[in-house]
Amino acid sequence: MALAEKIGGSQSGFVDMLNKRLKEIGATNTNFVNAHGLDAEGHYSTARDMSIIARELLKHPKILEFTSIYEEYLEKNDGSRIWLVNTNKLVRFYDGVDGLKTGFTKTAGYCLTATASKNNFRLISVVMGEDTSENRSSDTVKMLNYGFNTFKINIIKTKGESLGKVRVEKGKQDKANIVLLNDATEILKNTDPVTEYNFNLKVNKIKAPVKVGDIVGTAEIIDSEGNIVDEVDVTVEKDIKKANILDYMLRNLKTIGFGKSILKQN
C-alpha cells in the first residue's frame, strides 16, 4: 500500500495507473479497484489477461532473480532471522520454473501464473480457481509438460543480425546497418518442418542523431505460405552522430569526384 501511494500519489491514483497500463498492453478484460488485490466488487481478471501481464513483466528479466528464489532468511535489527519460503513450490521441484506469482482469495481460489524456460523456449501458464495449492501446482505441471512436449521454438534470426542498410538524414554516415532488436522466432509443433522465410523491413525515416537501441522500425517475418509469423523491432547497428558542416563539405567533394585526391594531399 505504501508503494502504491509512493508511485501513484494515492491508492486510487495508483489503481488508475494500473488500469491505464492494462489497456495499453491489451489486457482489456481486467479491472482493478484496489492496490492489494483482495476481492472487491468490480475487481476482476481472466487467465488470458494474466498471461498478457506476465509476458509484459518478463520484458524486465531482472524480476526472475527474485521470483526464482525458493527460500531466504531476512535478518532483523536484533539479529534474529525470519525464514521466508516461496509459495510457488515449482521453483524448487520443476526444472526450469523461475516465476512468477501465486495468489489466493475465497472468490478466486488458488491461482498460479507460472513461467518456465528450457532450451531457450519460455512458456507461461495460468491456473485459477483451484481447490488446493497442491492442485494448482499439479495442473501447472500438466500444462508445462504439454507445452514443452508438443511445441518448439524456431529461432529464424538472432538479435543483432543484419537486415540491410537504409538512408540516414543529417548523419555523419549517410547509411545505417539495420539489425534485429530481439530474436525473430516462430513457435512450431515438434513434428512441423522448418520452412523458408522472407523479411519485410518497415523502417521509419531515420534522422541523426540515432543510438543503438532506438526503435527505428519493424521487420515482418513471413513464412513460405505468406503468413506473418513474427514482427520484431529493429534498430541501428552503431550510433550515428549528427553531421557537422565539415562532414557535408567532404561528402559533397566525394560526390563530385575530388574527395579522394584532396584527402591524399592532406
Question: Which sequence ranges carry the predicted segments?
Answer:
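Acidic/histidine-rich, surface-exposed loop or edge segments in extracytoplasmic proteins
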Residues: 1
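Mid-domain, small-residue-enriched loop/turn segments at the edges of structured enzyme/sensor domains
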Residues: 4-55, 62
